[in-house]
Amino acid sequence: SLVKSDQICIGYHANNSTEQVDTIMEKNVTVTHAQDILEKTHNGKLCDLDGVKPLILRDCSVAGWLLGNPMCDEFINVPEWSYIVEKASPVNDLCYPGDFNDYEELKHLLSRINHFEKIQIIPKSSWSNHEASSGVSSACPYLGKPSFFRNVVWLIKKNSAYPTIKRSYNNTNQEDLLVLWGIHHPNDAAEQTKLYQNPTTYISVGTSTLNQRLVPKIATRSKVNGQSGRMEFFWTILKPNDAINFESNGNFIAPEYAYKIVKKGDSAIMKSELEYGNCNTKCQTPMGAINSSMPFHNIHPLTIGECPKYVKSNRLVLATGLRNTPQRERRRKKRGLFGAIAGFIEGGWQGMVDGWYGYHHSNEQGSGYAADKESTQKAINGVTNKVNSIIDKMNTQFEAVGREFNNLERRIENLNKKMEDGFLDVWTYNAELLVLMENERTLDFHDSNVKNLYDKVRLQLRDNAKELGNGCFEFYHKCDNECMESVKNGTYDYPQYSEEARLNREEISGVKLESMGTYQILSIYSTVASSLALAIMVAGLSLWMCSNGSLQCRIC
């Protein structure tokens, strides 16, 4: 009689993880390990970007800051900034009502500037033939008194005269210069002559690239900030060695200060109501800072810095481990003991904690689990490289900042919004499809690795062991721990055990043949006995029918 056979089984790791992923074919597949690649959290603060503070304008607008609204004095001189923060509806904008020409274009320009240096180009004291201090308004109060924008000068007539102005400034700096000026549009003709003496006036501005002539538009208007008049402001970039020339006989708002663009770089004007959080980040959104190495986020579509890509998804999880189907109980099943990971295994091993794939053996010396370190390490390297590759490919650094349009460009704004929404939809679809496909490939990859490990053992053992169909092999010979180890490390000596295996196979086959012979003898005896009994019954019935006349019997 044979003793209980030694066995070796191929299996895979399982744990208590409840992480779930989606694949092309399935949803909510529980896996042993997974990695979230969608950032969903932020700190709710405005932070320094790579150590450089933002310029947070608080209650001031960009126009209020650049022109010098008296309520924005804290921004008269500002250090280098990483990005600019402006509220959606800042209180301190153009205190004197009017318009800022090409304002949106100026903001776009600021998205490529990190530092201004304010310099005086035409001193206020140089206007000896005009009144340079009387140009103030109650619309721009400071300390309870009428005031005006700090960086421009509202020139008024002096001694009932407004001589024609001819003034030039040559940019001798090495940097570009942002120059601002304006025109006043009075409420009526009386205000025109009261302020400028001349009833018909103009302003001419010229550079190597600019040729502008402005005339005031006198009209009756509703009061804003107590004013019926309006002011319109303009700007230009004056290149090094270029000159700007002004000529006017009235209504001129002259530049006193200009901004030297001393540092260009990636910046942005971000609309946000948040406060400064005394923190540092690599990625800022209007909702708060993101500190993450993930390739995607769903916090806000507008960002500045080294940011993940925005997608509309709520969940993006990459499978890194295996299907997690722990073996619940050890019982015989038609398809074996373990799990369907390789088509024939029905459950993972929680007892194997030091690897993804491995072995369980049992012999007279005992039983135990052992991970296959080589295949596990190769799999870990492969999955890690794949995840890192996905992150690297998707984590291209870029900015998505809001674009502003004036009232005449609403159709362009709507078209731009539709295009951006379309791009976001495409990115979201691509990200979700990428995750589904990679998860399918990862789980198939693990399946393949388990199958390869099984084939490695099968090819070594050949007919020295029997495949049980559940990931296990039953040896036809004694296999001690040294023998088991040789199977695991691929050095199993088939010839050494082949004779013992052959004898045991033959003994098992003999028992089967003997059982089959006995079965056949019993079958033949049973068939003959049944046939004889049937013949006797037929003969008896015939004799009885002949004796009572029911059947005529003739013997020839």
UniProtKB/Swiss-Prot annotation:
Keywords: Clathrin- and caveolin-independent endocytosis of virus by host, Clathrin-mediated endocytosis of virus by host, Disulfide bond, Fusion of virus membrane with host endosomal membrane, Fusion of virus membrane with host membrane, Glycoprotein, Hemagglutinin, Host cell membrane, Host membrane, Host-virus interaction, Lipoprotein, Membrane, Palmitate, Transmembrane, Transmembrane helix, Viral attachment to host cell, Viral envelope protein, Viral penetration into host cytoplasm, Virion, Virus endocytosis by host, Virus entry into host cell. This is Hemagglutinin. Belongs to the influenza viruses hemagglutinin family. The keyword Signal does not apply. It is found in: Virion membrane; Host apical cell membrane. Gene3D superfamilies: 3.90.20.10, 3.90.209.20, Hemagglutinin Chain A, Domain 2. The keyword Magnesium does not apply. Disulfide bonds join C9-C472, C47-C279, C60-C72, C95-C140, C283-C307, C479-C483. Homotrimer of disulfide-linked HA1-HA2. Major glycoprotein, comprises over 80% of the envelope proteins present in virus particle. The extent of infection into host organism is determined by HA. Influenza viruses bud from the apical surface of polarized epithelial cells (e.g. bronchial epithelial cells) into lumen of lungs and are therefore usually pneumotropic. The reason is that HA is cleaved by tryptase clara which is restricted to lungs. However, HAs of H5 and H7 pantropic avian viruses subtypes can be cleaved by furin and subtilisin-type enzymes, allowing the virus to grow in other organs than lungs. Glycans are attached at N15, N16, N28, N170, N291, N489. It comes from Influenza A virus (strain A/Chicken/Hong Kong/715.5/2001 H5N1 genotype E). Residues 542-556 are cytoplasmic. The chain crosses the membrane at residues 521-541. Palmitoylated.
